[in-house]
Amino acid sequence: MAAAAAGTATSQRFFQSFSDALIDEDPQAALEELTKALEQKPDDAQYYCQRAYCHILLGNYCVAVADAKKSLELNPNNSTAMLRKGICEYHEKNYAAALETFTEGQKLDIETGFHRVGQAGLQLLTSSDPPALDSQSAGITGADANFSVWIKRCQEAQNGSESEVWTHQSKIKYDWYQTESQVVITLMIKNVQKNDVNVEFSEKELSALVKLPSGEDYNLKLELLHPIIPEQSTFKVLSTKIEIKLKKPEAVRWEKLEGQGDVPTPKQFVADVKNLYPSSSPYTRNWDKLVGEIKEEEKNEKLEGDAALNRLFQQIYSDGSDEVKRAMNKSFMESGGTVLSTNWSDVGKRKVEINPPDDMEWKKY
């Protein structure tokens, strides 16, 4: 009975104020009571703001930022909610968003310069981990709750993360090749979602921004050697790479991909390079020529026995007319491979019977 009375008293105390001090004492209990309070008053901006604080103390930053945003929707001038939104973004390592939030909050709070976020918030301001329950009584100074302090921390964190991103970006490679009508750039980035890729084309510039699976941003900006047609240029996101196709206005061969201020002499595609495999490598190979050499070798190769006979049939079929090919196909299929005729006027009128060689017997399996 006494326990029930104590619980009722605690509930009434929370409902009366939901102050930071009371929340500091028992964040989980405060969270439950605030949730009940919001069921009765779903449009109370302060309740959302204080519930965000409960979630912050419990380390639930993703949920906390949602409550802080809801509080700001209901009361855009609530700088405490702005501060708590920024704290969540900071601890989720979304430093750019946190910096923007703190800067906006500083404008709202220009008169006072700081806000109290609760006695248990000290460790949250200085650590990426939620505080232990036995340390929630630590005090917080005005400096720790100052928007300016948070802005500085975000800037320092951004500078550190940018250097890490630069190191990571330096490991990302891209390659390019060209055809007569387009230049194709391949970014060697795996497992990227299409919504996380933004590519912008201009006449002589390409800009690509990719949100990597790690959460970092990859930037590629190229000043192109020759003009392109932006509206006909496209990109495709695949599981193993990102493929960017730049449309050429004319069949000009690019000597290199980038050109900074230089005016290159256009070189037209000519017949002797038409069937070269497109590549940025200085070494090229004419595949038509290679195929021709292989065919010539096969033609001059001396075969014996069945191999020579098969070569003869292949040559007859390759050089034959449509009627010859039809006759060979029909006779071979209907006779079970025992007859091969080139006379369509004969085999076209009848079914070709099975006729094995004299020393062999036909068996059906």
Swiss-Prot record:
Claim: Ubl conjugation is one of the keywords in the record: yes
The protein, known as: Protein SGT1 homolog
Function: May play a role in ubiquitination and subsequent proteasomal degradation of target proteins.
Residue numbers of N-acetylalanine PTMs: 2
Gene designation: SUGT1
Subunit structure: Probably associates with SCF (SKP1-CUL1-F-box protein) complex through interaction with SKP1. Interacts with S100A6. Interacts with HSP90.
SUPFAM superfamilies: HSP20-like chaperones, TPR-like
Top-level division of the source organism's lineage: Eukaryota
Gene3D superfamilies in alphabetical order: 2.60.40.790, Tetratricopeptide repeat domain
UniProt similarity note: Belongs to the SGT1 family.
Entry GO CC: cytosol; kinetochore; nuclear body; protein-containing complex; ubiquitin ligase complex
SGS domain ranges (all copies): 276-365
Keyword field contains Ubl conjugation: yes
Biological classification of the source: Eukaryota, Metazoa, Chordata, Craniata, Vertebrata
Residues where Phosphothreonine is found: 265, 284
Subcellular location(s) of the protein: Cytoplasm; Nucleus
Stretches assigned to the CS domain: 169-258
Free-text domain note: The CS domain mediates interaction with HSP90.
Keywords: Acetylation, Cytoplasm, Isopeptide bond, Nucleus, Phosphoprotein, Repeat, TPR repeat, Ubl conjugation, Ubl conjugation pathway
